[in-house]
Amino acid sequence: MIEVPYATVAQRLMAGIIDLMIISVISMPIFIFTAKYSLFVQFSLATSSAVVLMTLYYSLTEGALSTSPGKKMMNLYILDSDSFRPISYRQALVRNIIRMADASLLYLPMVLNKDRRRIGDGAAGTIVVSKRRLSVRVISPEEYKKRKMVEGGAYSMDLAVAEALIDKIKEKASTFPAEKLENTIKYIERGIKIDEIKRRSMETIGSDDPCSILAFSVLAGYIPARSILSQQDFVDILEKASLFAFSQEERRSLSIKAGVLRGIDEAERYTKPFRLNILLRSMWDSPRLFREITPFFLASFFILLFSAFFAMWMPSDIVSQLKELMGKENISMPGPFVTAIMIILNNIKVWLLLYGGGPLIIASPSVTAINGVILGSVGGLLMREGRALDFLSAVLPHGVMEVTAILIASSIGIKMGLSLIFPGEKSRYESLKEVAMRYSDLVVLSAVLLFIAGFVEAFITPILMHEHSIAITVSILEIIVLYLFLLKSK
C-alpha cells in the first residue's frame, strides 16, 4: 500500500493550539486599545480583527515557510498535493480563507478523510505532512546478506533502501579528506575491533576499504547515518531505492517519500519573499476574471436587491437596536480613523465569510441575503421618515465599492458551491480547486475596494450626507470609473 506521511489529527490539533496561543498574544494590544470604547465597538473590532488576523497569520507564514510556527514545532509541513513542492502564497491564502467552511463543520472533513485533508486543503491543492512519520526501515547487515542471496535482482523495498544507502555512503565517504575519514574509522574502533569490522564488511558488502567500512558501520548501527549524510542525501537514497525496488507499488511509495522529503528540505532551506509584483499582477488580471464571473455577480446582485426590497417594507427596529448597542453618550466613541479601521475589518470579515463559506453551498447566498435585509430595513425606515435622499447620500459614496467587493466574494462563493454540486468528470476537490485558485486574484481587488470604501465611509460620507447632489454625482462617477475598469477588454 502506497502511504504518504500525512500529519495525524492529533498533530494538527496540537499545532493549531500553539498557533492560536501565538495569535492571542499578537491580538492582545487590540483588546487593550479598544477597552475605552463601547461594547459594540469592542465586540466589532475583536471579532473582525480575530478573523482577519488569523487569515493573515496563516497565509503569510505558510506562504513564506510552507509551515506555521505551530506546525514547525510539530514538524509538520504543507506541500502541493501533486508536486510535493512547498506551497505558494496563493495556495496559503486560499486554504486559510476556506478555513471558514472547515470551522463551520467543526473540521470534520479533516477527521473523516483518510488523507486528513480539510476542505481548505482540497480547494488549494495542498497536503499537510509529518516529517516524523517520514521513515524507512534500515535492515541489519545479517538481514541484508540473507535477502541479497534470496531475492537476487528482485529487490524488496528494504533491500533497495539498504543498497541505495550503502552506495550513497561510499560515494560521500570518497569525497572526505583523508584525515576526516581516518578519524571516523578511529571513532568506530572504540566500540569494536577493526579486524572484526573489516571481516564483517567484506562478508556483507564485499570490500574492506575505508569507504565500505563506513557504509557497513552505518548499516550495523555503529554510527548514525545523519552524522555523514545530509537531508538531500536521504532524498537521493530514496530516489535511487525507487529504481532498485522490484515491485511497482514499492517503487511508487519510495518515489513519493523522496518527493515529500525533497519538498520538506526545500521548505526548510528557503524562505519565499513576498513580492509586490504578486499584488500588481493580481490587479492586472482582475478585469478578465471579473468578466468570467459576471453571471454569478448578477445573480448575487439580484439576491441582494430582492432581499433589500423585501425588507424595505417590513417593520424594523434595527437602527434603534444599533444605537442601543453603540452605548450611552458618556461612553467614548472612536474617531474617524478608528471608525475607518473598524469598518474595513468588518467588511473584510464579511468578504472572507462569503468567499470562505462557498464550499458550504448555501452560505454565500445566505450571507448576501442577510446583508440585503439589513440594508433594506435601514433604508425602508429612513424612507418612511421622508429621508430617502439622506439614505442614498449616506450609502452610495462608499457603497459602490463596498457592495462590488462583497458581490465579487458572493459570486466566487456561489461558483465554488456549484462546482461541488456539479463537478463533471473531475473529483469534487479538483473541481473546487479549479474555481478557488483561479479566482483568488480577485482577493487583491476586493481588499483595495474595501480599504477605499472604509476610509470614504469614515471621512467623506459624513461630509456628503447632507450634500445630496454632490454625493449622488460622486457615486455615479465611481460607478462609471470602477465598471469601466472591471469590464474593460484587452
Name each region found by the language model.
Residues F337-M401, I408:
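Pore-lining transmembrane helices
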Residues R291-D317:
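N-terminal signal-anchor transmembrane alpha helix
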